[in-house]
Amino acid sequence: MGITVRNLHKRFGEFAALDDVSLDFPAGELVALLGPSGCGKTTLLRVIAGLEHADSGQVVLQGLDVASVGARERQVGFVFQHYALFRHMTVFENVAFGLRVKPRRERPSEAAIRAKVHELLSLVQLDWLAQRYPSELSGGQRQRIALARALAVEPKVLLLDEPFGALDAKVRKELRGWLRRLHDDLHISTIFVTHDQEEALEVADRIVVLNHGRVEQVGSPQAVYDHPRSAFVYEFLGAANRLDGTVSGNGFVAHGAAQAIAVDADFAGPARAYVRPHDLELAAPYARAQGIAADVRRVVRLGGSVRVELAARSGEVLEAELDRNAWRALALDVGDALTAVPRAVRVFPAR
């Protein structure tokens, strides 16, 4: 089922949680709502679910405006960050709960409920835990049970509020892949909230970047990462080096630098340039005409890669990331001088 929201506004006192938000969520897509704390992503999810009501605007499900319809009538499944399982119920009873509390005329038979629960527990690969209690499960297992419970009532839309936020990094990474595979099997329209850029880039079909209650950008993970429309999106979607300077006909000239860097810009004047650490090439001093003179300040070895912190002569602190073989070939150490050459630079007007 597709979802459309139009001109949503929601305030909490003086704080604008949603400021004229309009979005389309096509049927069958897995969409990430991504942004920093307080950007409005959870409020938007709760408004779609019917757990929160917008001050104005429309929420359209299956062609009907449901802005004034309660959560129960919207046929959405909601999974919270902190599981919300019933502690006094077994895994089986938790998953069966939504089916057993349906009105009598809609409630399946007990045999149908048992079959459905076992089907869902098999789907989340936890059928062997049916008679356990939540306190006997790991965090990752609890979250999968919470997802099975949400799916039991066959929702038209699945809404996930930072579903892996309370889990450790290793379990989060495993569950991200599992969620993507599950979605590929079920093709249920899914919207999930996250502040984890890597999670959104890895799992989602599309990403909606929010900031201060407004939509900054919508697009595929690759499009949003490679072609950010604003400095905010560039900085939020991963590690970024920032250089202040000026754009002219010759390119971008960083403050304190002698040489211009070739850039694709449709404006001139004060600017901020951004380059990813993996797009900052390191070379011997004066080896390149287009480059930034810097000194090695710190070296951090991260498994197969090396992160190099640089002190630019212009005063900025930069970060480069390269593989161990490339770093070894440079034969540099802390305190050594070098030239940092940006390979891919994005510039935005300075504000």
Curated annotation (Swiss-Prot):
It is found in: Cell inner membrane. It is a peripheral membrane protein. PROSITE patterns: ABC_TRANSPORTER_1, ABC_TRANSPORTER_2, CYSA. InterPro entries: AAA+_ATPase (IPR003593), ABC_SmlMolc_Importer (IPR050093), ABC_transporter-like_ATP-bd (IPR003439), ABC_transporter-like_CS (IPR017871), Mo/tungstate-bd_C_term_dom (IPR008995), P-loop_NTPase (IPR027417), Sulph_transpt1 (IPR005666), TOBE-like (IPR024765). Residues 3-237 form the ABC transporter domain. The keyword Nucleotide-binding applies. It is an enzyme of class 7 (translocase). This is Sulfate/thiosulfate import ATP-binding protein CysA. It catalyses: sulfate(out) + ATP + H2O = sulfate(in) + ADP + phosphate + H(+); thiosulfate(out) + ATP + H2O = thiosulfate(in) + ADP + phosphate + H(+). Coiled coil: none annotated. The gene is cysA. Its EC number is 7.3.2.3. Its main location: membrane. Keywords: ATP-binding, Cell inner membrane, Cell membrane, Membrane, Nucleotide-binding, Sulfate transport, Translocase, Transport. GO terms for molecular function: ABC-type sulfate transporter activity; ABC-type thiosulfate transporter activity; ATP binding; ATP hydrolysis activity. ATP binds at G35, P36, S37, G38, C39, G40, K41, T42. Part of the ABC transporter complex CysAWTP involved in sulfate/thiosulfate import. Responsible for energy coupling to the transport system. One of its GO terms (cellular component) is ATP-binding cassette (ABC) transporter complex. SUPFAM superfamilies: MOP-like, P-loop containing nucleoside triphosphate hydrolases. Belongs to the ABC transporter superfamily. Sulfate/tungstate importer (TC 3.A.1.6) family. It comes from Burkholderia pseudomallei (strain K96243). The complex is composed of two ATP-binding proteins (CysA), two transmembrane proteins (CysT and CysW) and a solute-binding protein (CysP).
